[in-house]
Amino acid sequence: MNNSEFSKIAETTIAYIAEKIEEQDKEASIDVDLQGDILNLDTDKGVYVINKQSAAKEIWLSSPVSGPYHFFYEQGEWTNRAGLELMAILTEELNIKFDTRPT
């Protein structure tokens, strides 16, 4: 994947996460702040940071619950070396339903 393809996929994924949270967080308990390719989620558990790392072609997640992760895009999913999937972690920790493969 070239840099342009990576940027498009990563930016689409990060925007999708922000959109899904705003749609499903009926109680407005998660403060969503998307600035460029950095998404901050202020929750009662702490602040999540999700951002694009172009040089590594990864999305990084900093979770106040489970710590830091680095995800790479493969076969339509963002997974880490341990096989954990970005959307699955966010679904579990934020109680928001995400599709594995955002469009």
From Swiss-Prot:
Transmembrane segments: none annotated. GO terms for biological process: intracellular iron ion homeostasis; iron-sulfur cluster assembly. GO terms for cellular component: cytoplasm. InterPro entries: CyaY, Frataxin/CyaY, Frataxin/CyaY_sf, Frataxin_CS. GO terms for molecular function: 2 iron, 2 sulfur cluster binding; ferric iron binding; ferrous iron binding; ferroxidase activity; iron chaperone activity. It comes from the Bacteria. Gene3D superfamilies: Frataxin/CyaY. The keyword Metal-binding applies. Keywords: Iron, Metal-binding. Signal peptide: none annotated. Belongs to the frataxin family. Involved in iron-sulfur (Fe-S) cluster assembly. May act as a regulator of Fe-S biogenesis. This is Iron-sulfur cluster assembly protein CyaY.
